[in-house]
Amino acid sequence: MTHIRRGSPPKSDPGFAVTHALVLAAHPMKDSFNAALHTRVVDTLTDRGWSVDDCDLYAENFDPVLSDAERRGYHDVPENRSPVESYVERLEAAEALVMVFPVWNFGYPAMLKGFLDRVFLPGVSFRLEDGKVKPNLTQIRRLAAVTTYGGTRLRAMLVGDPPRKCVTRAVWHVCRPRKTRYLALYDMNRATADDRAGFLSKVGREMKDL
């Protein structure tokens, strides 16, 4: 089910253009810190006057499993999009993409990884021209990730920090946005209440400026 929240354009700016954002959230616990980050993102963007498609993958019972048939038909454009047509349409409608997720085992949660596998398809997120990947989501002009790591940034760097690279390189490449933000709270396992509050405030500020 699509959950769209529409903010009110600032009265002081009659030329204000509403931006439509897709927020992808991937955490199973409603009382988690990640859920608080998700709420802060959606509320801040809505308060800016943006239209927000709030896509909570767990709440929507998204199936992250790529089927045998989907894999076999992966390159069959446009038929490849039919199993996830509604999500493809939501992605294609987005002018901004914000991903809110925890980093587990130095990677994406399976729910979010499955979304990328099933929805970021040939003919949707990219085109293959002479064997080269060309961006196909160039209507997305703003890209952000809001995430938490259990370990320190040094530990993440030692294994290459795959989530950061995937957002700032792979996802960035198929969008080519004007603005990109990667907001991470590292060492979450030892974060204090002040650390968490400070990061929540930072996320709010960054979403106002995205």
Regions found by a protein language model. Name each.
Residues 16-50:
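N-terminal beta1-alpha1 ligand-phosphate binding loop
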Residues 24-26, 55, 146:
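Short hydrophobic segments within beta-strands
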Residues 3, 15, 157-158, 162, ...:
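Glycine-rich phosphate/pyrophosphate-binding loop and the adjoining helix
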Residues 50-61, 181-186:
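A short beta-strand-loop structural module common to alpha/beta enzyme folds
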Residues 28, 149-153, 187-190:
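A short, flexible beta-alpha/helix-coil linker loop
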Residues 19-20, 51-53, 141-143, 179:
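Residues at the starts of beta-strands that form the adenosine-phosphate
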Residues 79, 83-166:
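Helix-loop-strand module that forms the ligand-binding subsite of alpha/beta enzymes
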Residues 57-78, 195-196:
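N-terminal beta-loop-helix "entrance" segment that forms/cooperates
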